[in-house]
Amino acid sequence: MVNESLNQEESNDRPAPESEFQMDTSYSTQPSGSIHPSVSGHPSVSGHPSVSGHPSVSIHPSVSIDPSVSVRPSSSALPSTLAQPSGLTHHSSLVREDSVIKVSKRRWVVVLVFSCYSLCNAFQWIQYGSINNIFMNFYGVSAFAIDWLSMCYMLTYIPLLLPVAWMLEKFGLRTIAITGSALNCLGAWVKLGSLEPHLFPVTMVGQVICSVAQVFILGMPSRIASVWFGADEVSTACSVAVFGNQLGIAIGFLVPPVLVPNIKDPEKLAYHISIMFYIIGGVATFLFILVIIVFKEKPKHPPSRAQSLSYALATTDASYLSSIVRLFKNLNFVLLVITYGLNAGAFYALSTLLNRMVILHFPGEEVNAGRIGLTIVIAGMFGAMISGIWLDKSKTYKETTLVVYIMTLVGMVVYTFTLNLNHLWVVFITAGTLGFFMTGYLPLGFEFAVELTYPESEGVSSGLLNVSAQVFGIVFTISQGQIIDNHGTMFGNIFLCVFLALGSALTAFIKSDLRRQRANKDAPETKVQEEEEEEEGSNTSKVPVVSEAHL
């Protein structure tokens, strides 16, 4: 074992003696030298991967580096790295800028702002369905027409996923965030033009605009978590990002029944509806401004080794369609797409039709129907947070996903056979139990998908999961609605139980191929540091201490 300690001052003042280091003849130290095509480094710095020392000394490929300094891996995606001798001429400050692993304090601001405008958009999705019967009376339309105010969110997502996912790769997080929040704001204000019984088409237009905004939102949680958070925080961060969407649904169940009472006078009803629309319009506008001010594209440094590798592997001419083809060749991911769609689709159908089911068993209980929906989502948010923290600690993605899926099935069965007991408190308990697992599953699916598909784009993988959810959501909502109208709520819920049982069985066949975790483990250990804002302008750097494992 040979240990060489490189002195800072000597490396800056003079090159290494020829007897100490000798360059490979294929490597050029001149700034004008050619760059080997197989190596991806900082945009302005690349080197030949084969660097040898003195002829009598062979440097082993496994080189340990001081935790404060990280060296960019080669594009072969192998985690091993080679230390750069002090005699090599390169822009060291630029290399350090791109290779140091740090997490930014801004990361929590970014994820919280995203959660807030995701909350606002989710509220607008469910605000009609939570008081389905009131809007039916106000606009003079059928229950199926009101259901489409919810289902348009699902339908719009399907054709727009691929263009928006491409935009996410092409233009980045900030552009997508601003576009999504702007559309969300616009849709909220358009609805204010629909405060007359004959203006149902206007409220539909506003809802469609909000549904387009949703396409710019749903695929973001796993991408934000990967780009901004460290390896031990990604699952928690993804849960926080999804948390906002779930909280918006919860508020959408709770607030509309309170703000819009079930009264017959159209003018008074229009006044109460306008209050709700003005509130959501003001909130959406404030959040749009907030996104412009605080949302950044990405942190100064990659927050994890896996993200650093992702930067190194990224190419500007990468084929977007080829990425999708690779994903569909991944059997484990295909199974997850199906199982996630079954679970999330059941949740969408249950949320859309909940008011109708509760009113059938408990007439006049619109407010309590909203509270039951609130209970489902609040319990699910706790489930999501607990699952995220557990995944960060245990990394048991397959096992956790399977257990949560099975418990979702159990909760759905219990809810199905207790709804007709005519005890409202029993419905609250069973619905809360169902929500804890059903809603808690949603962020698990996102994170499991990223693990199975790394280093493919998180936006593409999560987008495909959401397409599956929207397709099953439309099918389940229409089918269950028809079953409820013709055969009652029990058979409608049994319909969902059958598909949740199928999803549980398919989940058991998914292999735990955790590629992102392997990338983090196989790469050299790196001490993750909190990025101090005042350090961003500093050019000071530490020189690595290189340990050569073999002579």
UniProtKB/Swiss-Prot annotation:
Residues 1-99, 171-172, 229-233, 295-330, 395-396, 453-460, 512-551 are cytoplasmic. Residues 1-87, 519-551 are annotated as: Disordered. The gene is Flvcr2. Residues 519-529 have a biased composition (Basic and acidic residues). Disruption phenotype: Late gestation lethality due to reduced brain vascularization. Endothelial cells fail to adopt tip cell properties and display reduced sprouting, leading to vascular malformations. Conditional deletion in endothelial cells suppresses the import of choline from blood and results in microcephaly-associated vasculopathy reminiscent of Proliferative vasculopathy and hydranencephaly-hydrocephaly (Fowler) syndrome. Expression is mainly restricted to brain endothelial cells. Also expressed in renal collecting ducts and distal tubules and in placenta in late term (at protein level). GO terms for biological process: brain development; choline transport; endothelial tip cell fate specification; gene expression; in utero embryonic development; lipid metabolic process; lung development; membrane lipid catabolic process. Choline uniporter that specifically mediates choline uptake at the blood-brain-barrier. Responsible for the majority of choline uptake across the blood-brain-barrier from the circulation into the brain. Choline, a nutrient critical for brain development, is a precursor of phosphatidylcholine, as well as betaine. Also mediates transport of ethanolamine. Choline and ethanolamine transport is not coupled with proton transport and is exclusively driven by the choline gradient across the plasma membrane. However, the presence of an inwardly directed proton gradient enhances choline uptake. Keywords: Cell membrane, Endoplasmic reticulum, Membrane, Mitochondrion, Phosphoprotein, Repeat, Transmembrane, Transmembrane helix, Transport. Residues 31-78 are annotated as: 8 X 6 AA tandem repeats of P-S-[VSG]-S-[VIAG]-[HDRL]. It is found in: Cell membrane; Mitochondrion membrane; Endoplasmic reticulum membrane. Its main location: membrane. It holds the Pfam family MFS_1. The N-terminus contains histidine-proline motifs involved in heme binding. Can bind 2 to 3 heme molecules. This is Choline/ethanolamine transporter FLVCR2. InterPro entries: FLVCR1-2_SLC49-like (IPR049680), MFS (IPR011701), MFS_dom (IPR020846), MFS_trans_sf (IPR036259).
